[in-house]
Amino acid sequence: MRLTILLIIIGLIGYIINSGPLGRTNIIKLFISIEIMLLGVTLLIILSGYNNDDILGLIIGIIVLIITGIESAIGLTILVNYYKIKGSLPTNI
């Protein structure tokens, strides 16, 4: 339980630091921070399903991990292709 809260907080802090007036916006770091937060929430779903002996929580957690992997691959592919075409990544979001 502590690990999941720690992952969510680390992702949130990373998102806040890498966006807005606190730092230069880096879209890759924002993407990674969002993925860390989603991993924390998914781990929380899996652990709650395991603690309650509920198979549905485990199944939903696995489905979320699969969808997250697909979403990460598509997002990174779009960013790489954008970088190849434009020569730089957007810093204004």
Curated annotation (Swiss-Prot):
InterPro entries: NADH_UbQ_OxRdtase_chain4L/K, NUOK/Mnh_C1-like
GO biological process: ATP synthesis coupled electron transport
Coiled coil: none
Catalytic activity, reaction form: a ubiquinone + NADH + 5 H(+)(in) = a ubiquinol + NAD(+) + 4 H(+)(out)
Topological relation to the membrane, as annotated: Multi-pass membrane protein
Intracellular or extracellular location(s): Mitochondrion membrane
Stretches that traverse the bilayer: 3-23, 27-47, 55-75
Chief location of this protein within or outside the cell: mitochondrion
One GO location term (cellular component): NADH dehydrogenase complex
Superkingdom of the organism of origin: Eukaryota
Molecular functions per Gene Ontology: NADH dehydrogenase (ubiquinone) activity
Assigned EC number: 7.1.1.2
Alphabetized UniProt keyword annotations: Electron transport, Membrane, Mitochondrion, NAD, Respiratory chain, Translocase, Transmembrane, Transmembrane helix, Transport, Ubiquinone
Pfam families, per the entry: Oxidored_q2
Tagged with keyword Transmembrane helix: yes
Family, similarity comment: Belongs to the complex I subunit 4L family.
Reported function: Core subunit of the mitochondrial membrane respiratory chain NADH dehydrogenase (Complex I) that is believed to belong to the minimal assembly required for catalysis. Complex I functions in the transfer of electrons from NADH to the respiratory chain. The immediate electron acceptor for the enzyme is believed to be ubiquinone.
UniProt-recorded name of the protein: NADH-ubiquinone oxidoreductase chain 4L
Lineage, highest ranks first: Eukaryota, Fungi, Dikarya, Ascomycota, Saccharomycotina
Gene name of the record: ND4L
